[in-house]
């Protein structure tokens, strides 16, 4: 969950998000080192009047500044490709949930159950209870079992939407006429909030997403009560 004046990412709740945080730190370190080197060279150029004339034609220098950036790009690309393949990999999901974007709410269907569907609307500010979050609470939460592989099928009934939950490292476009999929695995129980992340009209900011991750026994009781 985000908090006021937060500068970093939300706490990782899935293996994918943990990998993304590590990749972010890895890349940020490379960017910091490159920026420091460039600033150091610029400061030297501005503070000295000496000129090394042979540097302009040095083949060794040209070789270094060609090979070194290539190595740096490889060091960035390889971890990125690994995470991309991990995000696309879906092996034997325990549960499949289909979500459809509408103007301006989400609908959910648990495809492993015969008749378990519902719509999820934002709760207006005037109806919020003490302790609830403005613009983030919904009337029907998406209850899912933790520590299990869940496949999310995402599409749209009207315009472009995007189903995003930052703490789980999820952001998948909901495109009319196309079915996208993503994997969801939570390592701990709790409430996880997200929002539509694609501008979709006047009420775009009123499309929150709330996932309630619970132990399997609690999920079985909830699903039985919904049928």
UniProtKB/Swiss-Prot annotation:
The keyword Metal-binding applies. GO terms for cellular component: mitochondrial inner membrane; respiratory chain complex IV. It is a multi-pass membrane protein. It is found in: Mitochondrion inner membrane. PROSITE patterns: COX2 (PS00078), COX2_CUA (PS50857), COX2_TM (PS50999). Keywords: Copper, Electron transport, Magnesium, Membrane, Metal-binding, Mitochondrion, Mitochondrion inner membrane, Respiratory chain, Translocase, Transmembrane, Transmembrane helix, Transport. It catalyses: 4 Fe(II)-[cytochrome c] + O2 + 8 H(+)(in) = 4 Fe(III)-[cytochrome c] + 2 H2O + 4 H(+)(out). The keyword Transmembrane helix applies. Mg(2+) binds at residue 198. Residues 46-59 are mitochondrial matrix. Its EC number is 7.1.1.9. Binds a dinuclear copper A center per subunit. It holds the Pfam family COX2_TM. SUPFAM superfamilies: Cupredoxins (SSF49503), Cytochrome c oxidase subunit II-like, transmembrane region (SSF81464). Its cofactor is Cu cation. Cu cation A1 binds at residues 161, 196, 200, 207. Residues 1-14, 88-227 are mitochondrial intermembrane. One of its GO terms (molecular function) is copper ion binding. Cu cation A2 binds at residues 196, 198, 200, 204. The chain crosses the membrane at residues 15-45, 60-87. InterPro entries: CcO_II, CcO_II-like_C, CcO_II_C, Copper_CuA, Cupredoxin, Cyt_c_oxidase_su2, Cyt_c_oxidase_su2_TM_dom, Cyt_c_oxidase_su2_TM_sf. Component of the cytochrome c oxidase, the last enzyme in the mitochondrial electron transport chain which drives oxidative phosphorylation. The respiratory chain contains 3 multisubunit complexes succinate dehydrogenase (complex II, CII), ubiquinol-cytochrome c oxidoreductase (cytochrome b-c1 complex, complex III, CIII) and cytochrome c oxidase (complex IV, CIV), that cooperate to transfer electrons derived from NADH and succinate to molecular oxygen, creating an electrochemical gradient over the inner membrane that drives transmembrane transport and the ATP synthase. PANTHER family: CYTOCHROME C OXIDASE SUBUNIT 2, CYTOCHROME C OXIDASE, SUBUNIT II. Belongs to the cytochrome c oxidase subunit 2 family. This is Cytochrome c oxidase subunit 2. It comes from Ceratotherium simum (White rhinoceros). The lineage of its organism: Eukaryota, Metazoa, Chordata, Craniata, Vertebrata.
